[in-house]
Amino acid sequence: MSSVRLPSVDRLLRSAAAAPLHQRYGREALLATLRDLLDELREPARHGALAEIELSEAVLAGRAGERLAAQHASRVRRVFNLTGTVLHTNLGRALLPDEAIEAITLAARYPLNLEFDLASGKRGDRDDLIAGLIRELTGAEAVTVVNNNAAAVLLALNSLGARKEGIISRGELIEIGGAFRIPDIMARAGVRLHEVGTTNRTHAKDYEAAIGPRSGLLMRVHTSNYSVQGFTASVPTAQLAAIAHGHGLPLLEDLGSGTLVDLTRWGLPKEPTVQEALADGADIVTFSGDKLLGGPQAGLILGNRELIGRIKKNPLKRALRVDKLTLAALEAVLGLYRDPDRLAERLTTLRLLSRPAAEIRAQAERLAPALGEALGEGWEVAVVDALGMIGSGAQPVARLASAALCLRPRQPRRLRGRALRNLEEALRGLPLPVIGRLDDDALWLDLRQLDDEPAFLAQLPRLRSELS
């Protein structure tokens, strides 16, 4: 095959085929992409490895358009979370309700009274935007908000216990994802760790014996991401608060996931509530906004007015504070808790957590034939019972009854691993990536969180081409 002459960059730029790309991406981006593309094709064209049609204006503009679309595609992608873990840290944790999304849009689009008191016309406090709701819902005297619960714990410790000892049970020295360890956080906060008791048993006398002139606070941490069972003992919040207050010390309780309602009402495992911790005497309570609360990422610090005041004066507070979008979403989510009877209908996270297994199974039965057709005869598609998780460290041993589509390759066991990896990759390559979990030589798609059934079905025909 003889060599083919490449069109010039200028000719391509002025072509009708490139006009939409110029309009959408701008001249500079289009110019750079066309130059790169022509540079790659110059050698094959010289050696006759390309046909004339492959170098037409329409074809080259099309290839440039594909590259530009990939370059300009958002790195933030919507996905289907079919892992069975509702509050999946890697997939964004809590899904916000419509009320919160509308509040974020309003706050993003218009000026608002973030730190402006409309009554007095003077500078305000951004925490006041949710303070009234928090007092109403929890009975806390005061509140401040930072960007996550790790920041809340760090700020509270530094404000109340810097250069002093923090007394905590050895069984509560937790580690969560991302290298968050209570001993390390205490050290960063300037608090000297004084651990008491043993891994499985800590008594009131252990705390009493540890208190001395260097003591700054007592700390209690809810071990939400693991469970110690068997021969165990711990000191309840009320008793620990009495010990702390008897020595003039504050009690800081970190609830981790945190919830404002009794989850057993919806058939979910019991989690300690913020109200219970405060009623039992905790002076400061910290918890997350984007876990069981069902809101945006945030760390809430509630409790004694004087102690919250000290925390708010800490210079670290400004470094850790939240923005207007977070506060707008948080206020909207908290507002839903005023009507607990409709909470499971309106709060997305609670609705998904409490979704009946029978409803999920019926959905799986509807979807199985379409998925089987998309995968072809090389795959077995079965509807099976499944056990999901709350996620994000909440109730680690509890399971949520669910249903899943179990996808198993009809191949010898030694070949299944590669087939499953290819299927995982193909599902991730769909326009709306599908994320499942591997278990027992199969890929499981737990449907608890599949809200948009039409969108899931619409892209299944592409699956076979992705696998080929």
UniProtKB/Swiss-Prot annotation:
Phosphoprotein in keyword set: no
Protein EC: 2.9.1.1
A biological process from GO: conversion of seryl-tRNAsec to selenocys-tRNAsec
GO MF: L-seryl-tRNA(Sec) selenium transferase activity
Function: Converts seryl-tRNA(Sec) to selenocysteinyl-tRNA(Sec) required for selenoprotein biosynthesis.
Protein name: L-seryl-tRNA(Sec) selenium transferase
Species this protein is from: Pseudomonas aeruginosa (strain ATCC 15692 / DSM 22644 / CIP 104116 / JCM 14847 / LMG 12228 / 1C / PRS 101 / PAO1)
InterPro entries to which the protein is assigned, alphabetical: PyrdxlP-dep_Trfase, PyrdxlP-dep_Trfase_major, SelA-like, SelA_trans, SelA_trans_N_dom
Top enzyme category: transferase
Cofactor(s) the record lists: pyridoxal 5'-phosphate
Pathway the protein contributes to: Aminoacyl-tRNA biosynthesis; selenocysteinyl-tRNA(Sec) biosynthesis; selenocysteinyl-tRNA(Sec) from L-seryl-tRNA(Sec) (bacterial route): step 1/1
Reaction catalysis annotation: L-seryl-tRNA(Sec) + selenophosphate + H(+) = L-selenocysteinyl-tRNA(Sec) + phosphate
Classification via HAMAP family: SelA
Keywords: Cytoplasm, Protein biosynthesis, Pyridoxal phosphate, Selenium, Transferase
Gene: selA
Family: Belongs to the SelA family.
Pfam assignment, any one: Se-cys_synth_N
UniProt modified residues of type N6-(pyridoxal phosphate)lysine: K291
